[in-house]
């Protein structure tokens, strides 16, 4: 199957720090891929690139058959303008560590705002979809609440519903439970398990929740110093890792949990 996402020899530096080092990998449509590894190994940078928030210094990223940061002019590729980037962003949505809800909008409007103003959906259609999604994440009774009236776990569930309301090809999840206590984190991870079962969406997830990664992933990528050092189905990578660095990382995560 042709890859929906392709990184081809992608490099990224911040000053003298190499964040991504000649990185190449692909993700198939509908695949659930989890990125694990120590902090600073480039995982979040990959998600930010797919949202066009960070540009690579080297290499090419392709999304849905089109170069992400370049556009075609005849037979040549030139740096992408804002119009191209805006069109490419419609393929992806991201749920961040912090919830980033609009504090002055009620829950329902937080979910309908982008579909109406970005996708151009009629308000009635956007609201019907939002009600359905908020029901799915267990918040049907909170439509008129403001974010400040919700727990952290509830706010993150609104953020998940908001992301799905955009009907993305790719759902990006960046440490979505890192700001939550264990009980609230478990609620959010249960919602994401339902998303993985219910929606035909490609998922790239950065997490330190190894049980969740095992449950939902088709493939797990272990990162270290801007490179993938191990790639395998979750049963293989967690039960029989081949790289010593992977073994040390998994031991450290288990010790912290």
Regions found by a protein language model. Give the residues of each.
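ABC family nucleotide-binding domain
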Residues: 3-234
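C-terminal boundary and immediately downstream tail of ABC-type ATPase nucleotide-binding domains
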Residues: 235-257
């Amino acid at each position: 199957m042709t890859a929906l996402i392709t990184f081809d020899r992608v490099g990224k530096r911040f000053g003298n720090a190499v964040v991504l080092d000649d990185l190449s990998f692909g993700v198939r449509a509908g695949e659930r891929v989890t990125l694990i590894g120590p902090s600073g190994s480039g995982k979040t940078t990959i998600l930010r690139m797919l949202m066009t928030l960070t540009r690579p210094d080297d290499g090419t990223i392709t999304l849905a058959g089109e170069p992400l940061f370049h556009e075609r002019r005849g037979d040549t590729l030139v740096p992408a303008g804002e119009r191209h980037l805006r069109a490419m962003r419609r393929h992806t949505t991201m749920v961040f560590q912090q919830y980033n809800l609009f504090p002055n909008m009620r829950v329902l409007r937080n979910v309908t705002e982008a579909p109406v103003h970005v996708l151009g959906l009629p308000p009635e259609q956007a609201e019907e979809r939002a009600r359905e999604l908020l029901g799915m994440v267990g918040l049907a009774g909170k439509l008129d609440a403001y974010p400040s009236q919700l727990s952290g776990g509830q706010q993150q569930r609104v953020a998940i519903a908001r992301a799905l309301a955009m009907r993305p090809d790719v759902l990006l999840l960046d440490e979505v439970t890192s700001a939550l206590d264990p009980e609230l984190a478990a609620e959010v991870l249960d919602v994401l398990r339902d998303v993985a079962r219910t929606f035909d969406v490609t998922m790239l997830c950065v997490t330190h929740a190894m049980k969740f990664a095992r449950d939902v992933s088709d493939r797990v990528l272990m990162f270290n110093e801007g490179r993938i050092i191990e790639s395998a189905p979750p049963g293989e990578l967690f039960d029989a890792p081949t790289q010593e660095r992977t073994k040390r990382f998994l031991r450290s995560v288990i010790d912290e949990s």
